[in-house]
Amino acid sequence: MRYRTFGATDLATSEVAFGTWALGSNWWGETDDPDRLVARALELGITFFDTGDAYAQGRNEELVGRALARAERDRIQISTKFGYELDERRREHGEGERPQNFSPEHARRALEASLRRLRTDFVDLYQLHNPRMDAIRRDDLFAELEALRDEGKLRHYGVALGPAIGWREEGLIALETRRVSALQTVYNLLEQAPGDDFLAAARRTGAGIMARVPTSSGLLEDKYTPETTFGPTDHRRHRPRAWLVEGLQKIERLRFLVIEGERSMTQAALKWILQQPGIANVVPTVTSFAELEEFAGAADAPDLSEEELERVAELHARAFDVEPARA
């Protein structure tokens, strides 16, 4: 594993982080044992764990806190999120957004609840979860985040954009006006906008970008076929069929990135992200030991050559020479 910091900050991270979203819910299908997954991640050198209070309505944080209880706190980084009203009745399923609350009072109340679930006195990164512009413009909210930092309950704060790709203006204002330490966004070989704009802004402000959905919801893991179907609770079931059909064609255009026995398609996808200036880490959602080993191996996989990077840029500019498929 390799390590870096978030831009000009002192927030450290393993290049490959552990996205815990799937733990405690069934929105990614079945998952392996959370305690053993986290233990193996630590063995592989992963130090950064990204969760959120809305994931399984707090249960995710409980699982992460339990799994990390024996880890040396000064050797790991815990990142969580706030902004949604929790509802115990929705612990298993993730469909649909809940009411949001970005009041200063909720930020403090939510953080204190997260600290209890995570079994820690502080979090390394506290993120606004899918904020809209009105939340990012709230001076009272950011004053409260500064107060919480002064109290030692958080080290850095940032913004996690979503739920879907986009939110360009929100991200740029968070970086350039609010001067957040971190911004988390969808970014991968197939989906590079508006991530490229965020990377440029982060380089100017000294922040770090966290790339979520780095394998485009599994497409770049090279495990789907045109016949692939997803379970009834799997969020990918709700994507249009064109996403799968076009994605598979694009992956074939990227086949040159694979080096047999040295760099898989998954690892090439993560490595490409890690070679973009301004990236702090990649945050794949981990559901199994096989995925975990594959993701962690990306940090030490061979870099993409300049020629390969240029070829990717040319393909992306031409939409990978793929005709739009019918939904």
Regions found by a protein language model. Give the residues of each.
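Active-site mouth loops of central-metabolism enzymes
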Residues: 21-32, 93-105, 130, 134, ...
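Short, acidic/polar
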Residues: 29-41, 102-118, 165-173
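Beta/alpha (TIM)-barrel catalytic core signal, keyed to glycine-rich beta->alpha loops juxtaposed to Asp/Glu
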Residues: 131-325
